[in-house]
Amino acid sequence: MPLPDFHVSEPFTLGIELEMLVVNPPGYDLSQDSSILIDAVKNKITAGEVKHDITESMLELATDVCRDINQAAGQFSAMQKVVLQAAADHHLEICGGGTHPFQKWQRQEVCDNERYQRTLENFGYLIQQVTVFGQHVHVGCASGDDAIYLLHGLSRFVPHFIALSAASPYMQGTDTRFASSRPNIFSAFPDNGPMPWVSNWQQFEALFRCLSYTTMIDSIKDLHWDIRPSPHFGTVEVRVMDTPLTLSHAVNMAGLIQATAHWLLTERPFKHQEKDYLLYKFNRFQACRYGLEGVITDPHTGDRRPLTEDTLRLLEKIAPSAHKIGASSAIEALHRQVVSGLNEAQLMRDFVADGGSLIGLVKKHCEIWAGD
């Protein structure tokens, strides 16, 4: 399929996607019943969309195009009420988190969807293994060239986004010792990590044309990059965050990305170059492994900085942009999180350290989601 022209969208508008866990009480393992919930809510959602993701244990909640985080929060809140009622009617529960702490990937059923079945044919068992749960944020751009500039700018802050959203310390019944283990699942994919270097939209079109020769890439949706342009929507999509445990944190993360995008495209503070990516995977690893306690390294100077310090610096830089787009509350909440030194991964470990079981942890996550 040829790459569509870049659809011009209103700059800095938002679209947010949350991949939620569908679980079966009282054992709180993953359920294979997302199709039941989708059928139950399909005529009750007035804004946004509830739909399938790769496997039947995943339920995606997606907003419409939103002006700001307040509009997005309102849409999510309305969807949440409908989904929670449908889940209760079918003896299911819903929660966030980047991974289910003890599910077995071998049990996961790929959705009966042409695209997902084609992906299963291409990637085999890897598709069942990617039963992990992330938050994706789309930001509107006025042109393809703006999208490429924004993608490179946001890529500088991938470690910050990962550390602030880290919520996947447990996998397959084991403490992984990572704050965010979810991104590791994609490491076997040939398109894992950052997008190959291009400097403008024309070069991106040539890149996509080359990738399509492999026959594994039919559309942008088939690419698993950390951040990717979405020409159909006229957006840049950030894909590195774990699904938070609360709607409020999900909205705050979206506000962070929206404000960062506003700062980047308004101020144009960087002259991007390919060398920017030399230490990308090392810095990304630091955020996944250690969360806010990680250390990132500047590929140009060799300077090493605590991720906590650099995140506070970012929040300070984007504060004026956040004020202009109505996202100041998000930046203030994230500032408090950084100062506290906590992320959701640490809260999960604290629960288990205090004697909680992994079953109890999922139950707790369901209570948190329903109570937010």
Curated annotation (Swiss-Prot):
Top enzyme class: ligase
Keywords: ATP-binding, Ligase, Nucleotide-binding
SUPFAM superfamilies reported in the protein's UniProt record: Glutamine synthetase/guanido kinase (SSF55931)
A Pfam family the protein falls into: GCS2
One GO BP: modified amino acid biosynthetic process
Catalysed reactions, as listed in the record: L-cysteine + L-glutamate + ATP = gamma-L-glutamyl-L-cysteine + ADP + phosphate + H(+)
Enzyme Commission number(s): 6.3.2.2
InterPro entries xref list: GCL_type2/YbdK_subfam (IPR050141), GCS2 (IPR006336), Gln_synth/guanido_kin_cat_dom (IPR014746), YbdK (IPR011793)
A GO molecular-function descriptor: ATP binding
Superkingdom assignment: Bacteria
PANTHER family in UniProt: GLUTAMATE--CYSTEINE LIGASE 2-RELATED
Family note: Belongs to the glutamate--cysteine ligase type 2 family. YbdK subfamily.
Quaternary context: Homodimer.
Job of this protein: ATP-dependent carboxylate-amine ligase which exhibits weak glutamate--cysteine ligase activity.
Protein name per its UniProtKB record: Putative glutamate--cysteine ligase 2
Organism, scientific name: Shigella boydii serotype 4 (strain Sb227)
Gene: ybdK
